[in-house]
Amino acid sequence: MAQNSKDAQKRASRAERRAAEAAEMKARAEQMEKERKQQTLIGAIVMAVLVILVAIGAFTVYHNMHKNTETQASTQTVEEAYDKLQQVENTPKLVDKKGGLLISKDGYGKSVEGAPTVAIYMDFLCPGCGNLHRQLDEDLQKMVDAGQINLDLHFMAFMDKWSTDDYSSRAANAAIYLAEHDSDPSHLITFLEKMYAEDFQPEESSNYKSVSDDQIKEQMIASGVSEDVADKAFGRDYQDWLDAIDTYTPKRSELWNTSGTYKDSMTTPTVTINGKFWDMNQLCTCLLYTS
């Protein structure tokens, strides 16, 4: 009788082990299938972004890129420039250590797990940035709202010398102030759309026509920002930080063009997806073979 009881216990133990192993294998298979579907979705979204870039005419963007030659030629190393950036006293609270402002469907600074991150480096006076944003921002907003992407915005202001009134710095400071004092990221994306609108973005150099703070303020309010926030957005609170960004960012070799006229230098606009740099010059070539 005792032997029968022991045998029954052994059989039960073996059955439990087999059941546990089967459950583990099933869970592993389900996880692998989930990861496969996730990677397929990520690949599809990345491809969609690239198709948009090609469709808007990468030629137009590429040939209107701007290179920050002064800061790139600086004798500071990228490590020294990074250290100086971290030492800036009035750093925006929402940006990461490399200057990125992350937006997702969950708000500022909250990454959607599994969604690819699209990073855009821009200057508000840069004509290539205008070409890019005029066609891309609406789609990016839809992808953000759907939780399909995380959007990582990097504001720069090295093109002040191509305006008569520090337009790049004033616009970038206003955008950062907006993000810091208005919790709705859609207001910032709408502000970008309006700032880069063809009937608003000024031309550069000798064709530049002065844009007042009040004109920029109107774009903020039209984007859903309160008058109280808009009124206080022009103190250039983050100028020291922007100056440090303009020195550090162009020295990041992972952002350098890998071909074309601007090879081995950083330009605006720059686009990365999950940290991978997408060379606008190569997108131009892609456009040639797909048109």
Named regions from a protein language model:
Residues 289-290:
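Conserved small/polar residues in nucleotide/adenosyl-binding loops
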Residues 175, 179-278:
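Thiol/selenol-based redox catalytic cores and closely related redox-interacting motifs
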Residues 123-130, 271:
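The canonical Cys-X-X-Cys-His
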Residues 46-57:
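Hydrophobic membrane-insertion alpha-helices, especially the h-region
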Residues 64-77:
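Ser/Thr/Pro/Gly-rich low-complexity linker/stalk segments immediately outside membranes or between
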